[in-house]
């Protein structure tokens, strides 16, 4: 019985791998045929537990998404957007880190009709809005916040929130946008010296750092939010 089960699982995984190739190619006609035969194909997953719906989003297939949305009587009738992969990532994590902001907006707008939770953590405590911050996806961060993402949630490993990740990964434009567009208090959770040590160790030049005190090696940015002090490093290492 166990052997039969393993064989069935392997066949399932091979089938999903084949479907993935056709999604990547953009073969919507073939996908439509499979969907009409078995609508639940969108929730089937590969060995990494990444569902077909996730792969559609990963490959940025807006035409596939619009086809799927037309097949449901209401959002979520068939498509499960809360499924997790082997690392605990949901489809929102994958959408958040993509360059194509319109794809995220399309899915948020569709599932937002019934109310959605976009603060789901993966197994490291990383939320979709943190993923977007790590990649410097400014529009995605703001869209997720608009739909209820909490930028002050911390991850499990470093204790960083969205703001911390934006600073830590050196995305100056995102930091400036958060200063301007997000009016609630945001807080830093790691000491300044740790950030500096990290950048020195990995030979990276930080664009933005945070300090709680003014110093002659720092210059305030004009976009400063009164909730916190955003500064640009001026010494020879930070240039």
UniProtKB/Swiss-Prot annotation:
Pfam families: Ank. Belongs to the asfivirus A238L family. A motif (PxIxITxC motif) lies at residues 206-213. Its main location: host cell. The lineage of its organism: Viruses, Varidnaviria, Bamfordvirae, Nucleocytoviricota, Pokkesviricetes. SMART domains: ANK. The keyword Repeat applies. Disulfide bonds: none annotated. Interacts with host PPIA. Interacts with host PPP3CA/Calcineurin. Interacts with host RELA/p65; interaction of the 32 kDa form with host RELA results in the formation of a stable complex with NF-kappa-B. Interacts with host PPP3R1. Interacts with host EP300; this interaction inhibits the association of host EP300 with host RELA, JUN and NFATC2. IkB-like protein that inhibits the binding of NF-kappa-B to DNA, thereby downregulating pro-inflammatory cytokine production. Forms a heterodimer with the NF-kappa-B subunit RELA/p65 and prevents the activation of the NF-kappa-B transcription factor. Inhibits calcineurin function, which is required for the induction of nuclear factor of activated T cells (NFAT)-dependent immune response genes. Prevents the binding of substrates to calcineurin without affecting the phosphatase activity. The C-terminal region contains the docking motifs PxIxITxC and FLCV, which are required and sufficient for binding to host calcineurin. This is IkB-like protein. GO terms for cellular component: host cell cytoplasm; host cell nucleus. It comes from African swine fever virus (isolate Pig/Kenya/KEN-50/1950). It is found in: Host nucleus; Host cytoplasm. Keywords: ANK repeat, Host cytoplasm, Host nucleus, Host-virus interaction, Inhibition of host NF-kappa-B by virus, Repeat, Ubl conjugation. The protein exists in a 28 kDa and a 32 kDa form, probably due to post-translational modifications which are neither phosphorylation, nor sumoylation. The keyword Ubl conjugation applies. The gene is A238L. ANK repeats lie at residues 48-80, 87-118, 124-153, 158-187. InterPro entries: Ankyrin_rpt (IPR002110), Ankyrin_rpt-contain_sf (IPR036770).
């Amino acid at each position: 019985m166990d052997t039969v089960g393993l064989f069935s699982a392997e066949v399932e995984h091979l089938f999903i791998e084949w479907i993935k190739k056709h999604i990547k190619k953009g073969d919507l006609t073939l996908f439509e045929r499979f969907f009409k035969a078995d609508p639940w194909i969108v929730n089937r997953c590969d060995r990494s537990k990444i569902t077909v719906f996730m792969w559609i989003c990963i490959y940025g297939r807006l035409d596939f998404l619009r086809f799927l949305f037309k097949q449901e009587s209401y959002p979520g009738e068939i498509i499960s957007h809360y499924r997790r992969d082997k690392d605990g990532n949901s489809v929102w994590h994958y959408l958040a880190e993509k360059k194509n902001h319109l794809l995220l907006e399309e899915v948020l707008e569709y599932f937002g009709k019934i109310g959605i939770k976009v603060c789901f953590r993966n197994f490291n405590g990383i939320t979709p809005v943190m993923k977007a911050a790590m990649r410097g996806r400014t529009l995605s961060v703001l869209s997720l916040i608009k739909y209820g993402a909490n930028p002050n949630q911390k991850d499990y490993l470093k204790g960083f929130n969205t703001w911390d990740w934006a600073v830590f990964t050196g995305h100056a434009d995102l930091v400036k946008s958060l200063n301007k567009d997000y009016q609630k208090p945001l807080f830093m959770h790691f000491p300044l010296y740790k950030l500096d040590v990290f950048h020195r160790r990995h030979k990276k030049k930080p664009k933005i750092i945070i300090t709680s005190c003014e110093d002659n090696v720092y210059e305030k940015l004009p976009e400063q939010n009164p909730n916190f002090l955003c500064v640009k490093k001026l010494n020879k290492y930070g240039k």
